[in-house]
């Protein structure tokens, strides 16, 4: 045993253990306390990958923590960290028709918040998303500006959509659900795969940042799956496989 400060090897006495069980020592020359062989605090990469896959596949944070023997806060931090390092979700090179709609959920003390989405009709990839407290024209316009440009846009009869600039694309109001079935289906996927969006559920987001991180992680994996299915239609693929 060698002191990391004065580099002496004599008079190195034991002085208890760390919470993880590693033996600690004290150098009687310089009074430096140290742990020669500390145990790693980080979980294995396989455990982290498994937790993220379970989250994308529909399990909530606390249930994942119970199954893997973790703390739910650890899983939450992993989701945020993974979302922060991901690029924007991949999208098709060309978009002919796009559909827009919104999903409402709760945040904090059951306050209502909206998730506005724009979806490609053909491949059903998410082209853009906004998390807002109010469905304002400015927020929806920003989403349209950032998304890939389409030739046709469809939505329900919410009046804000009719006042947007679509960069030369043609806008039409859907008659019933006939022209918005793709975005309705993708929004249903959000509620199916993200436990925090389940209806009549006790699982809801505490802050907008957590909701945005969950949406980015899921949409990234979902879009990759959709593009994979377009390229290889005969091979089955699940969303969790693209984490």
PLM regions and their residue ranges:
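Residue-level recognition of single "structural anchor" positions
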Residues: 1-243
């Amino acid at each position: 045993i060698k002191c990391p400060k004065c580099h002496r090897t004599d008079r190195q006495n034991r002085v208890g253990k760390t919470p993880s069980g590693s033996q600690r020592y004290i150098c009687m020359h310089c009074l430096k306390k140290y742990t020669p062989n500390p145990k790693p605090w980080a979980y294995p990469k396989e455990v982290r990958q498994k937790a993220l896959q379970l989250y994308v596949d529909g399990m909530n944070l606390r249930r994942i923590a119970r199954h893997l023997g973790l703390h739910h806060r650890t899983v939450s931090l992993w989701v945020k960290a993974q979302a922060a390092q991901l690029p924007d979700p991949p999208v098709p090179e060309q978009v002919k028709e796009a559909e827009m709609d919104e999903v409402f959920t709760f945040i904090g003390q059951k306050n209502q918040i909206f998730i506005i989405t724009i979806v490609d009709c053909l491949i059903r990839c998410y082209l853009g998303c906004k998390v807002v407290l109010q469905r304002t024209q400015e927020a929806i316009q920003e989403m349209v500006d950032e998304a890939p440009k389409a030739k046709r846009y469809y939505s329900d009869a919410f009046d804000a959509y009719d006042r947007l600039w679509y960069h030369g694309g043609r806008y039409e109001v859907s008659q019933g659900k006939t022209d918005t079935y793709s975005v309705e289906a993708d929004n249903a996927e959000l509620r199916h795969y993200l436990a925090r969006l389940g209806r009549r559920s006790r699982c809801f987001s505490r802050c907008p940042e957590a909701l945005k991180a969950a949406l980015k992680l899921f949409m990234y994996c979902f879009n990759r799956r959709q593009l994979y299915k377009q390229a290889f239609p005969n091979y089955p693929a699940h969303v969790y496989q693209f984490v």
